Amino acid sequence: MTTVSTTADAPAAASAAAPYLSVNNIEVIYDHVILVLKGVSLEVPEGAVVALLGANGAGKSTTLKSISNLLRAERGDVTKGTIEFRGKRVDRLTTNELVRMGVCQVMEGRHCFAHLTVEENLMTGAYTSRASRSEIRADLERVYHYFPRLRQRRASLAGYTSGGEQQMTAVGRALMARPSMILLDEPSMGLAPQIVEEIFEIVRDLNTKERVSFLLAEQNTTVALRFADYGYILENGRVVMDGKASELAQNEDVKEFYLGLSTAGRKSFRDSKHYRRRKRWLA
């Protein structure tokens, strides 16, 4: 298996501190039959941006839902392994309990309430908050500071806003819960490149200024590795490679199979021989 570093070395590479979030050898089964994750392990240090990369169907979204405990709504279950946040087991907590601990997920597809205004959507993120009204208004102003476009669209029905504005609304809604860890699923999906850059710049600002940690699942490997500190690559429900984002971006296998580049120049996925990749990585 080609690696940049081993998973066990990941905390040392990204941070000397103990991992903020630790996923340890988890297996996930849907409908008591379909094995989707096959021993996935990863770590997110406090204050880091970690990218979870891979093709569609590799297991990225399932990994995030395992952490946020949204699997049960889809008849899925973690049947092996543990998940720890701040040193405590969280794999059997409810989603509400995880939100109160500081873990929020922004799901793939944005999932805004189309019949509510942008501001009403944002306010739903404060539903579990024990903050006072003045504190909630301050949180709302903080969201508008990072997403000034949402201030302009605050009275518009979310269903009539653009895909980029809906993605911003979904992230802003998560911020209203005052998270210390955000699980961000496919933030670039269906968005124009300029909007993708804008959203990732905001993720960077939230990370550097607010110390919010991010675990983001993303198919856009090029953008994700530019903004992340560390990365894991999933293939068929397994972690096949991990390392510092800067090192992954220079790895020849990653260049060929995920960035569309090789020593011969840019290549398409159609031209790549995927069976060789699987044989090399999963042997």
Residue spans of the language-model regions?
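ABC ATPase nucleotide-binding domains
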Residues: 260-283
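Conserved ABC ATPase signature
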Residues: 157-161, 165
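Helical segment within the ABC ATPase nucleotide-binding domain
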Residues: 197-211
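The feature captures the beta-strand-to-loop junction immediately N-terminal to the Walker
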Residues: 53-55
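Conserved ABC transporter NBD signature motif
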Residues: 78-88, 135-140
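ABC ATPase signature
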Residues: 116, 160-161, 174-175
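A short, proline-enriched helix->beta-strand linker immediately N-terminal to the Walker B motif
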Residues: 176-180
